[in-house]
A protein has these predicted regions:
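Catalytic cores of alpha/beta
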Residues: 102-115, 139-150, 183-186, 191, ...
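Alpha-helix-loop-beta-strand connector modules within alpha/beta enzyme cores
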Residues: 89-101, 133-140, 171-191, 234-239
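Cysteine-centered motifs
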Residues: 11, 16, 28-33
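Histidine/lysine/aspartate-rich catalytic loop segments that bind and position anionic ligands
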Residues: 134, 140-165
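Glycine-rich phosphate-binding active-site loops on the catalytic face of alpha/beta enzymes
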Residues: 120-127, 155-167, 201-234
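N-terminal active-site wall of soluble small-molecule enzyme domains
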Residues: 66, 70-130
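Conserved, mostly hydrophobic/aromatic
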Residues: 48, 73, 109, 154, ...
Length: 239
């Protein structure tokens, strides 16, 4: 019996083109593919990116997000001063600092013992000697292939039509994402960004994304009296 790299018996179905591969063949009902499909699912990381502007009550809501099980907060305030970001961090309870990633003003990572930095056009390089988490954004599958090996994780966007940016539409077909997952390009180190909401989580798991990054879907609910129920649902679906 031929084995896949994970030790599963390779698919013996004549219609399965994925023989001996790690990723199960979609639509194939053979026991090998079914077993691999179950085994390769994993809890997804829950990421929230801050609103680009400073918002009243923001730090209280951030504390609330972490209380509901948020894995990482990406602090993104383009155009802000280091003093403004420092003050925001001071208002966030210290117990959450190790779960915060900066998009700007990287020296604050050492000052507050933060989780990591997110490279971007404004800040394309990590500080010299930096030993924390490094992530970056990708807008094509080619970028993912290039940047994933040197990153702890990467964002791929836009996966769905943006909630917060009018006219910012999905850039990838479902077929292209499925192929990238089957090839192992989309994996635990690739997080989906762009229009992500609760309704998309099951699909993102099917596509092997390791995490989901939320922006507009979460921040538009900041003053919703039922937001706690929604946040609990997100945490449960991602687990």
């Amino acid at each position: 019996v031929q084995l896949s790299p994970l030790g599963f018996a390779a698919c013996q179905s004549k219609n399965c083109t994925n023989r001996a591969n790690i990723t199960p063949q979609r639509g194939c009902s053979c026991l090998s593919c079914t077993n691999r499909a179950i085994t390769t699912y994993f809890p997804m990381k829950w990421i929230v990116i801050t609103s680009p502007d400073f918002v009243s009550g923001e730090t209280l809501f951030i504390d609330r997000l972490f209380g509901h099980g948020l894995d990482l907060l990406h602090l993104r305030k383009p155009g802000s001063t280091i003093e403004a970001c420092r003050e925001l961090l001071r208002q966030i309870p210290e117990r959450w600092h190790s779960r915060i990633v900066l998009h700007d003003h990287f020296p604050l990572t050492g000052e507050f013992l933060l989780h990591g930095v997110h490279l971007n056009r404004r800040c394309p390089h990590a500080p010299d000697g930096y030993m924390g988490s490094i992530s970056c954004s990708c807008h094509s599958l080619e970028e993912v292939a290039k940047k994933k090996p040197t990153s702890d994780y990467v964002f791929l966007s836009p996966i769905f039509n943006s909630i917060s940016k009018a006219g910012y539409e999905a850039a990838f077909s479902t077929a292209a994402l499925q192929h990238a997952a089957e090839e192992g390009l989309i994996d635990a180190k690739v997080y989906a960004l762009g229009g992500v909401s609760k309704e998309h989580i099951a699909q993102l798991k099917e596509l092997s994304f390791g995490g989901a990054a939320f922006l507009g879907d979460v921040w538009r609910r900041m003053d919703d009296p039922t937001v706690d129920v929604y946040l609990d649902e997100l945490r449960s679906l991602l687990s």
